[in-house]
């Protein structure tokens, strides 16, 4: 009886997977490329985006500088009675 329930579940999952509709947009707008040229184009786009993001992050660092570094010193060292 348990094996029958298992088979029914597996068949239902298989039917659901085969009949489900996946709607997603393609990574690349043009779909007429072959497999290898499509991968090359995707890789090139990813590298361009990575360079752009690195440029942005480096620009933010130069704008902020070291303003986030704390230059505060404890007046008498760490408090031994703290905690």
UniProtKB/Swiss-Prot annotation:
Coiled-coil residues: 38-58
Record GO biological process: cell-cell signaling involved in cell fate commitment
Modification Hydroxyproline occurs at: 75, 78
A molecular function (GO) term: receptor serine/threonine kinase binding
Annotated signal peptide: 1-24
Glycosylation sites: 78
Source domain of life: Eukaryota
GO cellular component, one term: apoplast
Disordered: region residues: 53-83
Tagged with keyword Phosphoprotein: no
InterPro entries linked: CLE1-4
Keyword set, alphabetical order: Coiled coil, Developmental protein, Differentiation, Glycoprotein, Hydroxylation, Secreted, Signal
Family (UniProt): Belongs to the CLV3/ESR signal peptide family.
Protein name per the record: CLAVATA3/ESR (CLE)-related protein 3
UniProt source species: Arabidopsis thaliana
Origin organism lineage: Eukaryota, Viridiplantae, Streptophyta, Embryophyta, Tracheophyta
């Amino acid at each position: 009886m348990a094996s029958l329930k298992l088979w029914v579940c597996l068949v239902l999952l298989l039917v659901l997977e085969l009949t489900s509709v996946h709607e997603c947009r393609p990574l690349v707008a043009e779909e007429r490329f072959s497999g290898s040229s499509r991968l090359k184009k995707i890789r090139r786009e990813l590298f361009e985006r990575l360079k752009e993001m690195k440029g942005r992050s480096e620009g933010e660092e130069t704008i902020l500088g070291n303003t986030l570094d704390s230059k505060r010193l404890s007046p008498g060292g760490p408090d031994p009675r703290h905690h």
